Amino acid sequence: PLDKPIRVVSAAQGFEFFDGDTLVATSAPSGFLPPPPDAPTPDQALNGRSHFPPEEAHAFPSCFVCGPHRKVGDGLRLFTGPADGFDGVADVWVPAPEFAGDDGRVRPEILWAALDCPGAFAVGFGDNPMVLARIAGNLHALPTAGDRLVVAGWHHFHDGRKHGAGTAIYTGDGQLIAQSEQLWIELKKA
């Protein structure tokens, strides 16, 4: 649920998040994550952007992270497509000032959002719309708004409607800022 209050309740291993009486999410410490691949170069990432699926093919064109209907500052506009020379998808991202805290650093919730959709495009979202079922991640640093970053995603596995992916955000020179491991579920065809 967006643009509405969510009730947060402390649980044994983390937190539970409720929309009214409906449990919509849980959180818990993620523990160790495997190291991500080396970062694609900014040029490879820009090449990935040029291979992002066409706007009319996007299942969720108003998505905050990857929606082509979003304007700069209203959404992240991450358009991760297959990047030549990198086994996955990538894009260059320059976080807008609207996504920074008072200290000029990109807010953690924005980094978590940026880790989301690249995983879907790495596992075939353009062909089969999916939703995120689980994400585990680590934020290693908070970049400054206006920094030139590289966002990447890669495929781990496919099992029926389940798909595993990893994502990462790197500095322009390849230093890891944040990473995630994800489980995506294909939507059932109508």
Located regions from the model:
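Short aromatic-glycine-enriched beta-strand elements
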Residues: Q13-F15, R161-T167
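Surface-exposed, gly/pro-biased binding rims or lids
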Residues: E181-A190
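Hydrophobic beta-strand-centered segment that forms part of the acyl-chain substrate-binding groove
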Residues: P1-P5, V9-A11, W112, D116-V151, ...
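Non-catalytic linker/capping segments at the edges of enzyme domains
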Residues: A12-D103
